[in-house]
């Protein structure tokens, strides 16, 4: 029986994983679930899966959860420092899913590595801002890493048993989001409602907006560069409106491999927990007959100007990537609250790339989590004071 921990159990990734586990409960024991505020959904999960440990990071929600579960023999904690009370390094759990969105996901990702045999990371911020810290701990504690993002899981699968220097180029695909065919003149009037209508994927609000600006692809390129130890010249984005082709690897022996699957995050999540097994997924597979027209084209950096940000990045890890992630996070929140216009997200991010105050961080490597978090807080305050 595999012992499991899920960080962000009430979000889309965590909920999808629990749905998978529900169909195979005899083979899994959930040791820990964590949430921020959604205690109502958490309590349902606790009862359904007989969970004995939970972490609720929002204090008011923690108090309510403690009260509601006082007779359920469930240990309720309020922060991730309590992981030391739940787990020990001499008896590692089998699998941890890190699916907390935003910067809040970095600390628990780093904290759980020493307690788990395998870690699946669905949190972009953790990889972009803290990969050198994560990589160091993965090696130190001999923890196996599996990427969950569909593009990176696809690359990871395609590169199986291949030497990392055995390929020329890796392509990741983008649907183009809801505005791939919208007149450029109409971009200034894009509403929050418009931007949340993704044509192919059902996702959370933050990542849906990132998909609309194409910032999610900027992040995915940065992630791929870090995870697979590449340089930016080896990576390229292609527009693929149907979203069933996720990655292409062009090898130096004249062959190229591609990976296709349905637009359903359950597939990479399922394979992250069942890799190296012959477990069958109870979900529809893609109809191969639909592959008659891949319809691939280069991305338009006039329509999606944030792609230009990649030109400002060094192949060396730096704190500048934290600035980009933090600024985007704050700008998306402002847009979702109708404080700024859609175009302001891209324009402000590009402006930041050309600001000397921030450019100095391009030569600075992140040394610890406090440095990353302090810079995140600083950038968030700076964006709030900027004239966007």
UniProtKB/Swiss-Prot annotation:
Signal peptide, first to last residue: none
Cofactor requirements of the protein: Mg(2+); Mn(2+)
Catalytic class of the enzyme: oxidoreductase
Catalytic activity: 2-C-methyl-D-erythritol 4-phosphate + NADP(+) = 1-deoxy-D-xylulose 5-phosphate + NADPH + H(+)
Pfam families reported in the protein's UniProt record: DXP_redisom_C (PF08436), DXP_reductoisom (PF02670), DXPR_C (PF13288)
InterPro entries: DXP_reductoisomerase, DXP_reductoisomerase_C, DXP_reductoisomerase_N, DXPR_C, DXPR_C_sf, NAD(P)-bd_dom_sf
Pathway: Isoprenoid biosynthesis; isopentenyl diphosphate biosynthesis via DXP pathway; isopentenyl diphosphate from 1-deoxy-D-xylulose 5-phosphate: step 1/6
E.C. number(s) listed in UniProt: 1.1.1.267
Domain of life of the native organism: Bacteria
Binding site for Mn(2+): 149, 151, 220
Ligand binding (1-deoxy-D-xylulose 5-phosphate): 124, 150-151, 175, 198, 211, 216-217, 220
GO biological process: isopentenyl diphosphate biosynthetic process, methylerythritol 4-phosphate pathway involved in terpenoid biosynthetic process
Keyword Manganese: yes
Family affiliation: Belongs to the DXR family.
Function: Catalyzes the NADPH-dependent rearrangement and reduction of 1-deoxy-D-xylulose-5-phosphate (DXP) to 2-C-methyl-D-erythritol 4-phosphate (MEP).
Name under which the protein is recorded: 1-deoxy-D-xylulose 5-phosphate reductoisomerase
Organism: Pelagibacter ubique (strain HTCC1062)
